[in-house]
């Protein structure tokens, strides 16, 4: 009697997990096929070409900053400037920026002053870039991005023609280590389902989001939402600014721009781990109960189908419902695999084979959620970009 009751509970849980993955597959397939692409609107003709200030914060980016700035200085748009801000780098980043600025009048080299304690480093650097800017439109991008020559003109054309207040592009995400390549498809399933362009672009939906690798906003509207000063303590400042835009009832458009911008998402497994922790730990401190529910949800939908499979074969094989449970488990795993492959190939534009590593990806994400839950109770430290930020309240402030 006990095994049957237990089997019934497990069966109900796994049916719910199956329903979740069915939903995810339908959602990401619909979103990928219907999401707008920059090339659809890139060639609109506009009469004016307002000046654009491209703001590039950089900290210890000697391996990527040169090719990034070269790609930005090679844009086919006429009226723009590039402002590169050194955020207290300890490598060759400052000298690379300085030497390049001497050769190209468009590039303005800025040394960020000492950062106040209640500011996150990148946010402070972006704010310094804004203060030095002279353009009507601001483009914020990262120092590890590479831009196609017509990325700026295409984005400005789209923004002006569509009478947008802000525009952000989904970049082609690049990573080099195998663990990150296996993890990214699974992680992006959740991100894509939450921050799908179809949701962000819906004015009736409150969800707003910027991709930090490329977001364009008029200086007037940037000031209206409070600049980076309003999100000075946010580790995920791009997402916070995107939310501010939607809260102010501004017209935000998120479009796929993988053919125009490439961005380095995680450089190694350590970067991947800390990138996840900077999202998860603040979540546990802001909304503890919700975070625990999310952690439990992540565990069940990612790992439970694999963990329960051998028990189904060993202990429930003689029950009629055991066969039903086995079928549900196998179908769920197949759907998980399908979602991962679809997201890898069509969503991330990387090889489909990386979607096959979904078991490793599921394990990494689940472990990070579980470990971060324990860490949030003790040493509330998040490491990001060679700095350690201590979280001493539910959300703020962060201290070096």
Describe every region a protein language model picked out.
Residues 159-162, 166-193, 220-223, 228-291, ...:
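Catalytic donor/gating beta->alpha subdomain of glycosyltransferases that bind UDP-sugars
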Residues 92, 141-158:
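Acidic donor-binding/catalytic loop of UDP-sugar-dependent glycosyltransferases
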Residues 20-23, 28, 108-131, 158-224, ...:
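Long helical/loop segments within the catalytic core of UDP-sugar-dependent glycosyltransferases
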Residues 79-88, 110-112:
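Short beta-strand/loop segment that forms part of the nucleotide-sugar
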Residues 1-46, 185, 197, 365:
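N-terminal membrane-anchoring/stem segments of glycan-assembly enzymes
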Residues 293-379:
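Membrane-embedded multi-pass helical conduit in multi-pass membrane proteins
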Residues 26-80, 89-90, 94-95, 99-100, ...:
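N-terminal signal-anchor transmembrane helix
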Residues 132-137:
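Short acidic donor-binding loop at the edge of a beta-strand
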